[in-house]
Amino acid sequence: MELSLLNIKGKDTGKKVVLSDDIFAVEPNNHAIYLDVKQYLAHQRQGTHKAKERAEVSFSTKKLKKQKGTGGARAGSRKSPIFVGGGTIFGPRPRTYGFKVNKKVKDLARKSAFSHKLKESNVTVLENFTLNAPKTKDYLAILKDLSLDTKKTLFVIADIDKNIILSSRNLKKAKVVSVDQINTYDLVNADKVVISEGSVSKIEALLN
């Protein structure tokens, strides 16, 4: 699969970039995508929820009333879950929501996401570039030249570039990741995926 290489002005440079069919032209596996996205979102949960049970609420342990003769039900402790303010029965406890997804499945999910985006013509390959300073205005100008300023865009760069990352951080619909930070959720969530020329070989090395 070949794509035209664009410069930061959105113009065709006349060069072609070859993308591996093993990554960008596989039959998308929706279940693999589902599992990887589900795992990613599960790991975002704090899991710090907690409700006090009867052993943890603070009340006197004195028997509320005598055992017999009142005509009412027996009551031994104010901490009982049947009373307002008493302990919670089977309440939430701190837990980890994460679960394991095999590496082969995760790789297949990312390949499927890339292939799906390319099939819909939502992948662009961009010439390598750097910014002299972290300026949101400069990064936004690049997105406008690429007609991507109104779309959710995932920009994949070969290595972490502090100026590019800081320049994009304040833009709600723009996200920049290095190759080793690519995840299925970001790929699926983006309207457009922009790949720097230098990151193509690294993506192939990561997923092959």
Swiss-Prot record:
Residues 51-79 are annotated as: Disordered. InterPro entries: Ribosomal_uL4, Ribosomal_uL4-like, Ribosomal_uL4_dom_sf. It holds the Pfam family Ribosomal_L4. GO terms for cellular component: ribonucleoprotein complex; ribosome. Keywords: Ribonucleoprotein, Ribosomal protein, RNA-binding, rRNA-binding. It comes from the Bacteria. Part of the 50S ribosomal subunit. NCBIfam families: rplD_bact (TIGR03953). This is Large ribosomal subunit protein uL4.
